Amino acid sequence: MIKSAILVLEDGTQFHGRAIGAEGAAVGEVVFNTSMTGYQEILTDPSYSRQIVTLTYPHIGNVGVNSVDKESLKVQAQGLVIRDLPLLTSNFRCEETLSDYLKRHNIVAIADIDTRKLTRLLREKGSQNGCIIAGKQIDAQVALEKAQAFPGLEGMDLAKEVTTKQIYPWLQGSWKLAGGLPEDKQEQDLPYHVVAYDFGAKRNILRMLVDRGCRLTVVPAQTSAEDVLKLNPDGIFLSNGPGDPAPCGYAIDAVKTLLETEIPIFGICLGHQLLALASGAETMKMKFGHHGGNHPVKDLECNVVMITAQNHGFAVDEKSLPSNLRVTHKSLFDGTLQGIHRTDKPAFSFQGHPEASPGPHETASLFDHFIELIEQYCQKNNRHNTK
């Protein structure tokens, strides 16, 4: 039986459609993502915590879902908005339909609405809070009240909500089409010990670090710098994550302390913003953010343009950069800051997602630069695990 659903934005705009997930209500910031593929990776990306994701590509669900293409243990997005859900799924890796997957994870979703109209509205007015109600009792006024009552992401510390609760090792490399997910690598085959802060880390980031010889110790977001240093790392990674970086004072303080050492530091997405804040810069809320797999970014040092995957609603304010930070990358969509490098420390960061998943891998060389810094650190300090 077809069940109705409604999406109501905080400005009162209504979109009526069909429920394709769980019954109930979902409230969050409504954003749009322009990726054509990778909807399962998007749904399971912790950076989408407290957000309702609108996918602009018209057909979503064609290939179903499987047990491999996930970036975390569960669906992280608050809700899903799409144009059309195909009646059939067709892929040799399909284990479940998208609709069944959403219901199993209790995710409210709506289809059969004009996603082009919604996207244009979000571009013109900026990201808005919204509410999806699905099921038998559809009340637009209740949805509006819920949307307007949502406080918004600015000032909200979500990293401590999505982070791991305990330290764990990660030794698994990247997935291959022929063999699927590989077995964990042996520690003796991974010469570099990297401590990875989990602010909402995507699994593909961890896998790409392992591919380059890193054995990872993943630690909770609120782990102190002192506890990290006790682990004796060769490098420190600051992961992606959701929400506003400014309230994450515990992380900013930890990074400040870690910057007093000579241990290489690499940050992605939220980790990029935290490195900037710890260095004395400021961040700002964007109008509608960057979400998609087709964003052109210029590498200012190599003078090349790369197509990147992006997922963030906050950015580092370039005007606030101190003298010890140099700009390395900028967005060609809106000129916002995309990359920084400390001039006095082996620390750098990137706003986009070089691991993609989904998206292009044109900035994967950033992982290689991190390894170069680690090798230099190990050689300089005569550490036993130098290649």
From Swiss-Prot:
Q: Identify which top EC class this enzyme belongs to.
A: ligase
Chain positions covered by the region annotation CPSase: 1-189
Q: Where does L-glutamine bind?
A: S47, G241, G243, L270, Q273, N311, G313, F314
In its UniProt record, a GO molecular function of this protein is: carbamoyl-phosphate synthase (glutamine-hydrolyzing) activity
Give GO BP annotations, semicolon-separated: 'de novo' pyrimidine nucleobase biosynthetic process; 'de novo' UMP biosynthetic process; glutamine metabolic process; L-arginine biosynthetic process
Q: Does the keyword Translocase apply?
A: no
Keywords noted in UniProt: Amino-acid biosynthesis, Arginine biosynthesis, ATP-binding, Glutamine amidotransferase, Ligase, Nucleotide-binding, Pyrimidine biosynthesis
Give the catalytic activity: hydrogencarbonate + L-glutamine + 2 ATP + H2O = carbamoyl phosphate + L-glutamate + 2 ADP + phosphate + 2 H(+)
The UniProt family comment states:
Belongs to the CarA family.
Query: What name has this protein been given in UniProt?
Result: Carbamoyl phosphate synthase small chain
Q: Which organism is it from?
A: Photorhabdus laumondii subsp. laumondii (strain DSM 15139 / CIP 105565 / TT01)
